[in-house]
């Protein structure tokens, strides 16, 4: 940020500050759109090194954020999303290196054809321009979003939650160092330098054409606000009410492993399972072992009458439970009459995010994968694979559940659009 913008920030003239950030980002986007793959990769290498070198400073900043969150009564799941460890910092740096290793989508010719008049037409991937990422508690989003936007030739404006402000600032310094070492404009990755919540509203306004797309990463209230108020396109999912359906033809050992991982690996992530559906035909063999396993692992189970009958520790499920993204060690559980009723339940209560079936019956699996209208559907795998890194995208800037432009994990390629290049030899239209 320039000295003039720092002065503006100090004077609390937020609209001027935000428009200045957007203007600088737009200028940086023009440079990035023409930057070579080698130059972008040089910056990513330097960013990864800087993150590792600054681990102590990042952890110290994060410890202050976590202490404030705990003092404010944050849930354990919220604190988990906010907390950084040495292992998570290493994973963050590794994630930047993975993005460096993926193919550069910019300039990729996806189609080429020749017309009868001799003209050659090419469809070519180009950056979107300026991306605004609005997120809450996860500071690693800074590195993921910064790396992906850089690789895809986009400038990015990052607006982290006030809870992660110090952590994001420490990580952002590493990203800027990488840009500087590669000779790229520092405004290519901008962190909004204030906790003022009014900054979100200004980003949603589009900043007079300064923002091309917005990606929210956070809870339902944030995403709902972004989708309701944004004046520019949004890549988002409102919530992750994800299901695991255990079919009557499921292998019990596999089902137990998948259900436990889908719920308890990290209960607060958007790919965590929130509802367990069990086929009535297999319930005599599968239901009690699954429920016992979850409760013994520290997960609260809220079930229908059939689920309550197998374990006195199960709490009664209410109608609201089927529509709830807990983001915690809680799961709703229900017995259904086969895959048809499971699909119907998911269509009524799901969020079109991620849903899984566990079965050894290929026909049942095919029906589930075809009929469940979610961005990600899985057969015999945990819902926690709903992640751009696990898809080979390097990382993700978010998960989109809409049906326009991007759906599922939004990686570098999904952060590009296209244009048509037409080569002629003097043709004129009759």
Swiss-Prot record:
The keyword Amino-acid biosynthesis applies. It catalyses: L-glutamate 5-semialdehyde + phosphate + NADP(+) = L-glutamyl 5-phosphate + NADPH + H(+). Keywords: Amino-acid biosynthesis, Cytoplasm, NADP, Oxidoreductase, Proline biosynthesis. GO terms for cellular component: cytoplasm. GO terms for biological process: L-proline biosynthetic process. Its EC number is 1.2.1.41. Its main location: cytoplasm. The keyword Membrane does not apply. It comes from the Bacteria. It is found in: Cytoplasm. GO terms for molecular function: glutamate-5-semialdehyde dehydrogenase activity; NADP binding. Pathway: Amino-acid biosynthesis; L-proline biosynthesis; L-glutamate 5-semialdehyde from L-glutamate: step 2/2. PANTHER family: DELTA-1-PYRROLINE-5-CARBOXYLATE SYNTHASE (PTHR11063:SF8), GLUTAMATE SEMIALDEHYDE DEHYDROGENASE (PTHR11063). Belongs to the gamma-glutamyl phosphate reductase family. Catalyzes the NADPH-dependent reduction of L-glutamate 5-phosphate into L-glutamate 5-semialdehyde and phosphate. The product spontaneously undergoes cyclization to form 1-pyrroline-5-carboxylate. This is Gamma-glutamyl phosphate reductase. It comes from Nitrobacter hamburgensis (strain DSM 10229 / NCIMB 13809 / X14).
């Amino acid at each position: 940020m320039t000295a003039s913008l720092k002065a503006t920030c100090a004077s609390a003239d937020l609209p001027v500050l935000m428009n200045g950030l957007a203007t600088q980002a737009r200028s940086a986007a023009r440079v990035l759109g023409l930057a070579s793959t080698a130059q972008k990769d040089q910056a990513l290498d330097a960013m990864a090194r800087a993150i590792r070198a600054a681990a102590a400073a990042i952890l110290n900043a994060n410890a202050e954020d976590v202490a404030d969150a705990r003092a404010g009564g944050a849930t354990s799941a919220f604190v988990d999303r906010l907390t950084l460890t040495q292992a998570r910092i290493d994973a963050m740096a590794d994630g930047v290196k993975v993005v460096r290793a993926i193919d550069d989508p910019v300039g990729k010719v996806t189609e080429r054809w020749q017309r009868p008049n001799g003209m050659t037409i090419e469809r070519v991937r180009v950056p979107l321009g300026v991306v605004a990422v609005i997120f809450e508690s996860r500071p690693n989003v800074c590195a993921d979003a910064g790396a992906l936007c850089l690789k895809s030739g986009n400038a990015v404006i990052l607006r982290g939650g006030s809870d992660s402000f110090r952590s994001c600032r420490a990580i952002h310094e590493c990203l800027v160092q990488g840009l500087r070492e590669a000779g790229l404009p520092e405004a290519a990755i901008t962190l909004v330098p204030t906790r003022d919540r009014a900054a979100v509203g200004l980003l949603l306004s589009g900043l007079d054409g300064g923002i091309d797309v917005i990606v929210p990463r956070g809870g339902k209230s944030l995403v709902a606000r972004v989708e309701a108020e944004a004046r520019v396109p949004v890549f988002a999912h409102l919530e992750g009410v994800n299901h695991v359906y255990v079919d009557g033809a499921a292998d019990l050992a596999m089902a137990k492993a998948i259900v436990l991982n889908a719920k308890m690996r990290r209960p607060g992530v958007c790919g965590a399972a929130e509802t367990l559906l069990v086929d009535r035909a297999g319930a005599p063999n599968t239901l009690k072992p699954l429920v016992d396993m979850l409760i013994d692992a520290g997960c609260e189970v809220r079930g229908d009458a059939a689920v309550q009958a197998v374990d006195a520790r199960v709490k009664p499920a209410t109608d609201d439970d089927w529509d709830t993204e807990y983001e915690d060690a809680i799961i709703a559980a229900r017995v259904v009459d086969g895959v048809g009723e499971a699909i119907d339940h998911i269509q009524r209560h799901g969020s079109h995010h991620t849903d899984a079936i566990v079965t050894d019956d290929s026909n049942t699996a095919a029906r589930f994968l075809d009929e469940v209208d979610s961005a990600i559907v899985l057969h015999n795998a945990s819902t926690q694979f709903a992640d751009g890194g696990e898809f080979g995208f390097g990382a993700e800037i978010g998960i989109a559940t809409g049906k326009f432009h991007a759906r599922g994990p939004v990686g570098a390629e999904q952060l590009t659009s296209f244009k048509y290049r037409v080569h002629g030899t003097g043709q004129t239209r009759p």
